[in-house]
Design a protein with these regions (language model features):
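Zinc-dependent deaminase catalytic domain
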Residues: 1-121
Length: 121
């Protein structure tokens, strides 16, 4: 991952569905906002100045006008609850992750209720 985070490097790739299935349509990694200083701001034990890999990947698609409807996400770590919600809301239908990381049962429930398939690789 290209992440500059010292604690955990996370990467995310989103691939298409349909006729152009499995083509990369967006990607992101966790890190500081573009153009912002790489200055850590921790509150309640969590970094506040960075954007999660999944969020950056969705922003990448949005900047380029790419629909994520029906797409699949490959991410290095189990998504946090906020990323799970925005991945579902953006039209993602499948999340495949490599490593367990603070797996939240509520995130699993929310994804299941919104018919998003969650698979550990």
């Amino acid at each position: 991952s290209r992440s500059s985070c010292e604690r955990l490097r996370v990467g995310c790739v989103i691939v298409s569905s349909g006729e152009q299935k499995n083509r990369i349509i967006a990607a992101g990694y966790n890190g500081f906002l573009p153009g912002a200083p790489h200055h850590s701001r921790v509150r309640d034990g969590h970094e506040q100045a960075t954007v999660h890999a999944e969020q950056n990947a969705i922003c990448d698609a949005a900047r380029r006008g790419v629909s994520l409807e029906g797409a699949t996400v490959y991410v290095t770590h189990f998504p946090c609850i906020n990323c799970a919600k925005i991945l579902s809301a953006s039209g993602i239908r499948c999340i495949k992750y490599h490593s367990d990381y603070r797996n939240d049962e509520l995130a699993k429930e929310i994804l299941a209720e919104s018919q998003v398939v969650l698979l550990k690789l």
